[in-house]
């Protein structure tokens, strides 16, 4: 499946990534992307920036190297109440919010605890996508959470770095099952490289293969085209971005 948008990338601002936004944009262009989301880790992750960093993304140009830039964040799920570590004042300056479990922030627990947290994240309304859900350290009720995500138009991320098998070990088969359930429930799927170095931006080959094997319809993959991604943002209640009228 062709994927023209990468919704999960990091710059050196995350504290453990190694490229600038301009370097990421250059690689995105070389790798055939039309658009990507810049989604550095939010402040509870060791080494991550203060929330002002995310609020000030309003100064970023909408295109770098002729690639569209989506202003985003990978926030941390903090507790079972579904709170995330982004100050509410930042929301108006962001286009895209991922919420993910990370071991340094949320101590792995049991299925019931993780499920409760994810359901409350979804219902809280601030989050557009759930990141790298395949991690076996954060097992959850796939059916219940993905059904809730489908009902609230929250996208399920399939993460290319996870599928390489070196990070979040034990996730690959779980990602296939998550994709199968998302297909059955009619949930939206998003695709992220989770690049921590510029050459990986737009590296979505393993995700593309998975989606093909599972038989997910491209109409439910919001990263199939920039038009589909922007339509999803509007569906989520976000304002249209004037500079992206070129994609209409």
UniProtKB/Swiss-Prot annotation:
Record: residues binding Zn(2+) 2: 16, 41, 196
Cofactor: Zn(2+)
EC number(s) on file: 3.1.3.-
Cellular component terms per the entry's GO annotation: cytosol
InterPro entries: Phosphatase_YcdX_put (IPR023710), PHP_dom (IPR004013), PHP_phosphatase (IPR050243), Pol/His_phosphatase_N (IPR003141), Pol/histidinol_Pase-like (IPR016195)
Chain sites annotated for binding Zn(2+) 1: 8, 10, 74, 194
CDD domains per UniProt: PHP_HisPPase_Ycdx_like
Key words, A-Z: Hydrolase, Metal-binding, Zinc
Cofactor notes: Binds 3 Zn(2+) ions per subunit.
GO molecular function terms attached to this record: phosphatase activity; zinc ion binding
UniProt entry tagged with the keyword NAD: no
Record carries keyword Disulfide bond: no
NCBIfam families tied to this protein: PRK09248.1
Family per similarity comment: Belongs to the PHP family.
Protein's recorded name: Probable phosphatase VS_II0429
Organism: Vibrio atlanticus (strain LGP32) (Vibrio splendidus (strain Mel32))
């Amino acid at each position: 499946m062709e994927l023209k948008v990468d919704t999960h990338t990091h710059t050196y601002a995350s504290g453990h990534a190694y490229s600038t936004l301009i370097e990421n944009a250059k690689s995105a262009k070389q790798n055939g992307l039309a658009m990507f989301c810049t989604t550095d880790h939010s402040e509870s992750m060791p080494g991550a920036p203060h929330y002002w960093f995310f609020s000030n993304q309003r100064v970023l140009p909408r295109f770098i190297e002729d690639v569209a830039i989506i202003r985003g964040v990978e926030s941390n799920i903090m507790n079972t109440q579904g709170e995330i570590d982004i100050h509410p004042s930042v929301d108006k300056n962001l286009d895209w919010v991922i919420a993910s479990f990370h071991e340094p922030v949320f101590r792995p627990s049991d299925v019931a605890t993780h499920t409760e947290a994810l359901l409350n994240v979804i219902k809280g309304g601030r989050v557009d996508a759930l990141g790298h859900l395949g991690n076996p350290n954060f097992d959850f009720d796939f059916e219940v959470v993905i059904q809730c995500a489908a009902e609230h138009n929250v996208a399920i991320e399939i993460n290319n770095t996870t599928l390489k098998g070196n990070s979040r070990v034990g996730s690959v088969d779980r990602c296939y099952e998550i994709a199968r359930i998302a297909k059955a429930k009619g949930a939206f799927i998003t695709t992220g490289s989770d690049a921590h170095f510029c050459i990986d931006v737009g590296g979505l080959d393993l995700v593309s293969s998975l989606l093909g094997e599972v038989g997910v319809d491209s109409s439910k993959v919001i990263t199939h085209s920039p038009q589909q991604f922007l339509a999803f943002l509007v569906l989520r209640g976000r304002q249209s971005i004037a500079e992206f009228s070129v994609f209409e």
